[in-house]
């Protein structure tokens, strides 16, 4: 006879199931399990007296006969594709199957085989997400990588060579020599990396050599001169060589206004950085480009969300990041032209509408590399508090809003940069770059981070304890060391560099993967974030209107996922 147990008892044993709801951290966001791919009464769980034992939930099948390398049991997947419960099977560093795990010789409906060679990660009561992608990195110091990884980011894309002044201001790794050195340096780090070449040139040869050297994308930055000629040249090279172009437009409007920049872009695909404008771009109306079909608009996290301290801290940050001098009036005016509370407030709302598609950091150059994920969920919380439930929500949950916001740092930057065949979502065939969270710590402190199917960092207690005793904090694990590091992480390069054998030429120890499909995409390809409102900015008051509606909200004085989570 089947046994019946209460929902609370079931959830404590196997995690929440269809119809159960849970809160994300200390936010006002509540998710509901949409479906459950496991089978009631046939759930697998590891431990003393539990199911995954020889002849029970564990079969006799070898790896050659289809047994998984690792199975994550009973995980609650939170992804742009949905919010659902499943077992997840990993093989060869990728997601092999999402479904029902167990022993097909003793259990019905098993499509994920557990064998003697299978490791188990207990996902009961935990949330599983794709590893995050930060697509706006100034590689100013290598220590950024540790902070980023331990926050749940598994892929970093950007440019730089260290604390050189070009890197402090712009996300470019200029020239074949520097690109080669950064590709070699990437071998040391347990994270996926990709590098941007400098895109500011009026003739193509200097850009083409950077793409052939291994640049996965090109960056146009106003500090190097983002003129119409440079924009056109860079995009022409990108179209021929299939790499993405990121743009930081002309704050001073020296070589044209936002309309001139859009004309120079000419309908070609481009990723617009910090599209609100505080991070740089045509003042005061760069935010207009969120309505363009060919522009992928993104935010950097210092303005996300709009709080009581946002405006005050920005002026000092900007003076430092762009090598400005307070004694020069023109430098001060340049800085002040970029900080507008009206456009910063509108940015939150445009994210909630799905008009901004991506959130990234702008690491150490007005952004915080370890806070991309936290600030994304703080913004989602703020918008629920201030705007209420989304009209498209069904049921007593925030699933649609949660799916929209998680897409901003997972699938959408991956699509924008030609990486979505490999990363960006919890889907079969993609790399097993995954993050497990305790729901109470969701968005603040990951429990486990997997890279290529191996644990690279985790919350861990005293190594000298008889058990892993408190205090717990995130520490590097075995996947972050030795040859395992090189087998788990990859470096993304251009197709031209991959075909030229860049890995062998530079004797890289990490594998390389080519970016692909960056030019025939646009705003419509941004998952759950493809809205294209018509934006108008009042040049005197800076008020922002979308399709005629005034966009304004108040700054928050207190946020979730903040001080109470970071005592140590």
Curated annotation (Swiss-Prot):
Q: Which InterPro entries match?
A: Amidohydro-rel, Metal-dep_hydrolase_composite, Metal_Hydrolase, Urease_alpha_N_dom, Urease_alpha_subunit, Urease_AS, Urease_asu, Urease_asu_c
Q: Does the keyword Nucleotide-binding apply?
A: no
A single BP term in Gene Ontology: urea catabolic process
Which compartments is it annotated to reside in?
Cytoplasm
- Give the GO cellular component terms, alphabetically: cytoplasm
Enzyme active site: 322
Q: Which cofactor does it need?
A: Ni cation
* Pfam entry (one): Urease_alpha
Q: Which GO terms describe its molecular function?
A: nickel cation binding; urease activity
Keyword list, A-Z: Cytoplasm, Hydrolase, Metal-binding, Nickel
Main subcellular location: cytoplasm
The source's superkingdom equals Bacteria
What are the binding positions for Ni(2+) 1 in this chain? 136, 138, 219, 362
Listed binding positions for Ni(2+) 2 are 219, 248, 274
What this protein catalyses is: urea + 2 H2O + H(+) = hydrogencarbonate + 2 NH4(+)
Which residues does this entry mark as bearing N6-carboxylysine? 219
Cofactor notes: Binds 2 nickel ions per subunit.
What does the record give as EC number? 3.5.1.5
Q: How does it assemble?
A: Heterotrimer of UreA (gamma), UreB (beta) and UreC (alpha) subunits. Three heterotrimers associate to form the active enzyme.
Family, similarity comment:
Belongs to the metallo-dependent hydrolases superfamily. Urease alpha subunit family.
Official protein name in the record: Urease subunit alpha
| Species whose genome carries this gene | Cereibacter sphaeroides (strain ATCC 17023 / DSM 158 / JCM 6121 / CCUG 31486 / LMG 2827 / NBRC 12203 / NCIMB 8253 / ATH 2.4.1.)
């Amino acid at each position: 006879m089947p046994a019946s147990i209460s929902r609370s008892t079931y959830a404590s044993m196997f995690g929440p199931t269809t119809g159960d709801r849970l809160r994300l951290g200390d936010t006002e966001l509540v998710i509901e399990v949409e479906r459950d791919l496991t089978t009631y009464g046939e759930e697998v769980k590891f431990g003393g007296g539990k199911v995954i034992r020889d002849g029970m939930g564990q079969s006799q099948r070898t790896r050659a006969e289809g047994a998984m390398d690792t199975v994550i049991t009973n995980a609650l997947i939170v992804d742009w594709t949905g919010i659902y419960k499943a077992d997840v099977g990993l093989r060869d560093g990728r997601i092999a199957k999402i479904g029902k795990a167990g022993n097909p010789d003793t259990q019905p409906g098993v499509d994920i085989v557990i064998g003697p060679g299978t490791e188990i990660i207990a996902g009961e009561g935990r949330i599983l997400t794709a590893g995050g992608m930060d697509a706006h990195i100034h590689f100013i110091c290598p220590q950024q990588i540790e902070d980023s990884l331990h926050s749940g980011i598994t892929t970093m894309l950007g440019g730089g060579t260290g604390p050189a002044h070009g890197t402090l201001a712009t996300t470019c790794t200029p020239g074949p020599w520097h690109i080669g050195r950064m590709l070699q340096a990437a071998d040391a780090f347990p994270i996926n990396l990709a590098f941007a070449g400098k895109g500011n040139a009026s003739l193509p040869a200097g850009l083409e050599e950077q793409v052939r050297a291994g640049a996965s994308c090109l960056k146009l930055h106003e500090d190097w001169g983002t003129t119409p000629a440079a924009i056109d040249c860079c995009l022409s090279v990108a179209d021929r060589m299939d790499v993405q172009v990121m743009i930081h437009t002309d704050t001073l409007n020296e070589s044209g206004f936002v309309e001139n920049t859009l004309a120079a872009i000419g309908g070609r695909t481009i990723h617009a950085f910090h599209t609100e404008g505080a991070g740089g771009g045509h003042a005061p109306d760069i935010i207009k480009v969120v309505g363009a079909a060919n522009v992928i608009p993104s935010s950097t996290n210092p303005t996300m969300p709009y709080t009581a301290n946002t405006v005050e801290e920005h002026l000092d940050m900007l003076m430092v990041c762009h090598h400005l001098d307070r004694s020069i009036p023109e430098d001060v005016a340049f800085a002040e032209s970029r900080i507008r509370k009206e456009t910063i407030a509108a940015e939150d709302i445009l994210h909630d509408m799905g008009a901004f598609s991506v959130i990234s950091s702008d690491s150490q150059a007005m952004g915080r590399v370890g806070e991309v994920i936290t600030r994304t969920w703080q913004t989602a919380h703020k918008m629920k508090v201030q705007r209420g439930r989304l009209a498209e929500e069904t049921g007593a949950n925030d699933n649609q809003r949660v799916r929209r916001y998680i897409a901003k740092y997972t699938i959408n930057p991956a699509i924008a940069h030609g990486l979505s065949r490999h990363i960006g979502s919890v889907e079969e065939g993609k790399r097993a770059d995954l993050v497990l969270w305790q729901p109470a710590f969701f968005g603040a402190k990951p429990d486990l981070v997997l890279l290529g199917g191996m644990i690279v960092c985790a919350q861990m207690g005293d190594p000298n304890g008889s058990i892993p005793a408190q205090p717990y904090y995130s520490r590097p694990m075995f996947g972050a060391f030795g040859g395992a590091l090189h087998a788990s992480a990859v470096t993304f390069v251009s197709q031209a560099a991959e075909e030229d054998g860049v890995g062998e030429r530079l004797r890289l120890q990490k594998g390389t993967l080519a970016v692909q499909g960056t030019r025939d995409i646009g705003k419509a390809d941004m998952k759950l974030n493809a809205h294209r409102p018509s934006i108008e900015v009042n040049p005197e008051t800076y008020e922002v209107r979308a399709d005629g509606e005034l966009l304004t909200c108040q700054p928050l004085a207190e946020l979730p996922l903040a001080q109470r989570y970071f005592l140590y």
